């Protein structure tokens, strides 16, 4: 399975690693596969996603997958940020 996901899927197409990780975070949130989320949040940071971009990705999930699912993902993401020394709360963004 890992070979399919990380070999075949990740090596195809025009998406950047950052874009792939943000999409993976979205899919994990929507499917409530939250046990895999910490590793993917970390991978997104390593791929160049900013904490704000990761949070915005999750905020965009709320109207489509529901607020309760999004809150769980945000709580996990905040734990990853804290472990990485990322100060919370993040600066306000205008949207």
Question: Can you say where each PLM-predicted feature lies in the sequence?
Answer:
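Mid-chain, well-packed structural core segment of small domains
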Residues: 35-55
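Short, structured motif recognition centered on aromatic/hydrophobic residues
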Residues: 20-28, 57-58
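Generic hydrophobic/packing signal
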Residues: 49, 58-61, 65, 81
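Acidic, glycine/proline-rich low-complexity segments that act as flexible tails and inter-domain linkers
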Residues: 1-18, 41-42, 46, 70-95
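Residues in soluble alpha-helical coiled-coils and helical-bundle/repeat scaffolds
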Residues: 10, 31-32, 49
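Short amphipathic alpha-helical segments at helix boundaries and their inter-helical linkers
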Residues: 29, 33-42, 61-76
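Short, charged low-complexity intrinsically disordered segments located at boundaries
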Residues: 32-33, 54-59, 88-93
């Amino acid at each position: 399975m890992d070979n399919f996901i990380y070999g075949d899927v990740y090596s195809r197409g025009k998406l950047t690693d950052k874009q792939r990780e943000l999409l993976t975070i979205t899919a994990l949130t929507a499917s409530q596969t939250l046990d895999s989320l910490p590793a993917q949040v970390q991978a997104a940071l390593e791929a160049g996603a900013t904490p704000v971009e990761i949070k915005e990705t999750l905020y965009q999930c709320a109207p489509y997958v529901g607020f309760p699912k999004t809150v769980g993902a945000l709580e996990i993401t905040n734990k990853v940020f804290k472990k990485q020394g990322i100060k919370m709360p993040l600066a306000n963004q205008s949207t």
